[in-house]
Amino acid sequence: MYVKVNPSSYSVAIYEIAKESNKIKTFHEQFSFVKKVIEKNPQLITFLKNDEIALEKRFELIDEIFGSLEVDVKNSIKVALVRNMIFVLRKIIVDFLKITNYELGIKFAKVITAYPLSDSELEKIQKKLNEKTKKIVEISTEVDEKLLSGYKIIFSNQLYERNYNNDLQKIKKTIIKGKEDEK
């Protein structure tokens, strides 16, 4: 039997609950946490999808893992479980976060460096971006050893970079252009 699934309607419903209870920021933070947990532990969704395990046991696991979260956040996960929507829980959360990102004025930046950044370095970058944009900026990081040193920041379709690899590429282009001009 074919069942049509619309994760966006669940996301909007969760948003409405958050808005009615004046807890949009709290829900945003808590669903961000839930998203990280299910991304780091894909076996959790596999366990929750397993109909051979009693529903009560699966509810207990949700309460155990997410016990400190708002009741409505936990209940949203349980509703997805009962309605056989747990396999799209991540999509529901992503859609919800997109709605709340807009509502809360949150922007995103990707910081690519040659080595892992410390928490204090990330905080400095985030603070600088927050000040520059007058928005809340959430940062994701990536390590790219080809940079040799320095960084790239991708933010709002703009690229800011200061790294040796980029400098070497510019020098290379200048040298090649110079040789072509000599001919």
From Swiss-Prot:
It is found in: Cell membrane. HAMAP family: ATP_synth_delta_bact. F-type ATPases have 2 components, F(1) - the catalytic core - and F(0) - the membrane proton channel. F(1) has five subunits: alpha(3), beta(3), gamma(1), delta(1), epsilon(1). F(0) has three main subunits: a(1), b(2) and c(10-14). The alpha and beta chains form an alternating ring which encloses part of the gamma chain. F(1) is attached to F(0) by a central stalk formed by the gamma and epsilon chains, while a peripheral stalk is formed by the delta and b chains. It comes from the Bacteria. The keyword Transport applies. This is ATP synthase subunit delta. It comes from Mycoplasmopsis synoviae (strain 53) (Mycoplasma synoviae). Keywords: ATP synthesis, Cell membrane, CF(1), Hydrogen ion transport, Ion transport, Membrane, Transport. GO terms for molecular function: proton-transporting ATP synthase activity, rotational mechanism. It is a peripheral membrane protein. The keyword Cell membrane applies.
